[in-house]
Amino acid sequence: MSSGMCPVCGLPKELCICEEVAKEQQRITVKVNRRRYGKEVTVVEGFDASEIDLHELSTYLKSKFACGGTVKGNTVELQGNHLARMKEVLMEKGFSAEQIKN
């Protein structure tokens, strides 16, 4: 298929709603882990990597929270404790409040 077409539904990228439908079906968990030397890492998990572009989401979250981070498997890890604002920011990105669990 051409690069302007969605590989899932076959519609042009401008008309594709596959990612929005995928967002509605996911259960997202947000938690804070302590790593070496007492550093805190916010872990956001529960994404379906085949439906959501995790690297694009990671870039968006890193710019919103002004921190570093990475994508590991189906999780996004951000440096620091961002538990308080994470639900609000994910809702801005199109996820519903019922899907997000702290």
Curated annotation (Swiss-Prot):
Keywords: Protein biosynthesis, Translation regulation. Disulfide bonds: none annotated. GO terms for biological process: formation of translation preinitiation complex; regulation of translation; translation reinitiation. GO terms for molecular function: mRNA binding; translation initiation factor activity. InterPro entries: DENR/SUI1_TIF, SUI1, SUI1_arc, SUI1_arc_bac, SUI1_dom_sf. It holds the Pfam family SUI1. It comes from the Archaea. The keyword Iron does not apply. Belongs to the SUI1 family. PANTHER family: DENSITY-REGULATED PROTEIN, DENSITY-REGULATED PROTEIN HOMOLOG. This is Protein translation factor SUI1 homolog. It comes from Methanosarcina barkeri (strain Fusaro / DSM 804).
